[in-house]
Amino acid sequence: MNDEISDLINQAVSNILINSSSENKLKKLIKTHDVKIHFVPRNYRIFGGILQSMNIQFGNFLEEFMTLLIKSDGRYDILEEYSGKKSNKFQLSTSNDNRIDQFISFCQRSDSINLDEEFPKLLNEVKNDNDTNLSSISHDIDILFRNKETGVIYYLEVKYNDDHDTGKFVDINRKFIKTYAYLVREFPNTEIKPILFFFNNKKMKGNIYVPENTNIRRGKSFFDEFLKIKYEDVDSYIRNLSESPDNIKAFDDLYRKIMAMK
């Protein structure tokens, strides 16, 4: 693993620790928890909340991290105009909007849907839609990259872990499919492959909206298919970093700092 990648990980961990323990943040947390009635001591609640915040920040960092890995591989171009941007301007037809919502509802009702057949059919209908009744949409894109040799564009929706509750899980998949609809209108003459990517290998439950084999990649499977760097090397580096004396000391110091707060 090259120095640029390891430096990015180290800097991200350092930034997360600093952001999570700033005096301003701690004052806000004290104010929030002072007015709550709870059997768990206040400072323990604050520490638990900070750990949860760190988890969220690490998930957000993964977009930047995966972008660097893809860019440094050499075989791909990151579409900088769209990738990582939070307010891209797109258009969505009324028919595609309804078509995707109906597909989501159908998947929820059906016990026997064949996603390997129905999902590609949906994507094809979305791509070939000619409805001119359009709505303008401001929308974020996690990662968009192009294979230099084939010209295929890959849309990557990045998630840290497959552990979302039911409501959020539905929203993730709906957003994933609608983003594809935005992109095929933006790039009408280009093959676009949407991939729902989970950084961890863990599979919590089956996806009833998106086929596992063609449009979902988990941890190692994405690295093996798209990247020269090995997933095991990244996994090992982060695990070793998490258990390093310096990192453990940083968390011990944070714990003592919070427990000493009045």
Swiss-Prot record:
Keywords linked to the UniProt accession: Endonuclease, Hydrolase, Nuclease, Restriction system
Segments crossing the lipid bilayer: none
GO process annotations (BP): DNA restriction-modification system
InterPro entries named among the record's database cross-references: HinfI
EC number(s) given by UniProt: 3.1.21.4
Chemical reaction(s) catalysed: Endonucleolytic cleavage of DNA to give specific double-stranded fragments with terminal 5'-phosphates
GO molecular function terms attached to this record: type II site-specific deoxyribonuclease activity
Top-level enzyme category: hydrolase
Keyword Secreted tagged: no
NCBIfam families linked to this entry: restrict_HinfI
Protein name, as recorded: Type II restriction enzyme HinfI
Gene source species: Haemophilus influenzae
Lineage: Bacteria, Pseudomonadati, Pseudomonadota, Gammaproteobacteria, Pasteurellales
Gene label: hinfIR
